[in-house]
Amino acid sequence: SHFSLAYYKNNKWTIKQFNRFMEVVEALKLNDINIQTLHICNSPAFLNYPNMHLNGARIGSAFLGRVDADINVGLKKIGKLKCSIEEIKIVPKGFNIGYLNSYKTKKETRIAIVQLGYIEGFNIGTRQDMFRFVDKLRNLSHSIKSFFKKQNLKVTINDKKYNIIGKLGMYHMAIDITNSDVKIGDFAYLEVNPLYIDSKIERKYV
């Protein structure tokens, strides 16, 4: 059993699924089969349908703080990549950075090189399903908003945010650290979804 539309509150299909589940439970009871632990809620259902909790739940994405639901319960995203800064350079105005010369410096710029890229799972996501027309509209709306919204990839170094500049590489990235005291050996922290982190990356749980 698994809810397919529990992302939405008061969804008729979700209620129908739950009622079917309970009908099976009652049928088992009539045959003297008593299930000790009953659970049907995934993460969205656990948040949106408290009356369906029964005496167990199977949450998954909620553990990562990345669940889609119509309720804001203050979940915090977990999962960060940590990598030390191995190289620092000062480049002149008009210097091209990244594949396709995707960024040109507007002034003399101090950059930090971090040996970490998308192959480790940074800035990686799933492709949006577009089986339904409404999914296509939602994806189009998201793309239009992203087009007009300035979104810089950022890292955190010494509790401060810094912009990644240039096209993200497979194994590396460049960070604008102009007018900062960032030095070689400092650590850069990048927010990531743990589901996409490469298996070779060492995991530490705190």
Regions inferred by a protein language model and the residue ranges of each:
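Short, solvent-exposed loop/turn elements at beta->coil junctions and helix N-caps
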Residues: 44-45, 100-102
